[in-house]
Amino acid sequence: MKIAILSRDGTLYSCKRLREAAMRRGHLVEILDPLSCYMNINPAASSIHYKGRRLPHFDAVIPRIGSAITFYGTAALRQFELLGSYPLNESVAITRARDKLRSLQLLARQGIDLPITGIAHSPDDTSDLIKMVGGAPLVVKLVEGTQGIGVVLAETRQAAESVIDAFRGLNAHILVQEYIAEAKGCDIRCLVVGNEVVAAIERCAKAGDFRSNLHRGGVASIATITPRERDIAIKAAQTLGLDVAGVDILRAARGPLVMEVNASPGLEGIEKTTGVDIAGRMIQWIERHATPEFCLKIGG
């Protein structure tokens, strides 16, 4: 097959691993910067061009689209879909997952357990928002934040009010969430491919922090997950329409809670920790599902 990887930086670990895994299985691979793609939207002859040339047909496309370029990145991916390329994750699913409010609403509707969460736009009634999620301590986040950026633990009501008031000055969308103390600064990242959790790690925050993101200095170790955690991770990914997802779970006293579903999970931390060839599993999924029948369906 001919496979395109949509990424702004082909030197990143995940891109290199996906390219290596695909080539090892005999596929042709090209890495394309989605922001350098431009599209001819034409009922007679739509096409995608890249750096002065019209791109050939690709059997499959692997989107590695950062949150900062979600709008144009998913537009480019959608054009590939309309031209009959199989997407490892569909553009509509990525857009759905990147919208934190929408994704939480969909997960809640499906009965998936979540931390108690409130979302507001520059709320005037700060005290009621805090009360709504059970009071302090609580976590305050910018809805648009990623990798632990724009996330604050407010341990008292006064601190929570101060943080929310500060965020209000940014004219931003604010997410307020109960703090799960028993998780002790750790979460479980489940890597879902299709209907299977292919690997799982526990990520724990560095001393003095509560954010477990590896980009923020968190430490990873192999996790043994329960059947319930496995099922909730798969259900969360499927609810958002994702074939590949990183599902972050908090271990609360009342059971596993889904904190976030990542549509473009990094592979470095979880592959190096577990030794699982996740990139290879993703390519195998493409091989099983990038059929002519599917491509004709999505292209239409």
UniProtKB/Swiss-Prot annotation:
It is an enzyme of class 6 (ligase). ATP binds at K141, E178, Y179, D187, R211, S212, N213. One of its GO terms (biological process) is translation. SUPFAM superfamilies: Glutathione synthetase ATP-binding domain-like (SSF56059). PROSITE patterns: ATP_GRASP (PS50975). Its EC number is 6.3.2.-. GO terms for cellular component: cytoplasm. Mg(2+) 1 binds at D248, E260. InterPro entries: ATP-grasp, ATP-grasp_RimK-type, ATP_grasp_subdomain_1, RimK, Rimk_N, Rp_bS6_RimK/Lys_biosynth_LsyX. Its cofactor is Mg(2+); Mn(2+). Gene3D superfamilies: 3.40.50.20, ATP-grasp fold, A domain, ATP-grasp fold, B domain. Mg(2+) 2 binds at E260, N262. Mn(2+) 2 binds at E260, N262. GO terms for molecular function: ATP binding; metal ion binding; ribosomal S6-glutamic acid ligase activity. Mn(2+) 1 binds at D248, E260. Binds 2 magnesium or manganese ions per subunit. Residues 104-287 form the ATP-grasp domain. An L-glutamate ligase that catalyzes the ATP-dependent post-translational addition of glutamate residues to the C-terminus of ribosomal protein bS6 (RpsF). Is also able to catalyze the synthesis of poly-alpha-glutamate in vitro, via ATP hydrolysis from unprotected glutamate as substrate. The number of glutamate residues added to either RpsF or to poly-alpha-glutamate changes with pH. Belongs to the RimK family. This is Ribosomal protein bS6--L-glutamate ligase. It comes from Salmonella typhimurium (strain LT2 / SGSC1412 / ATCC 700720).
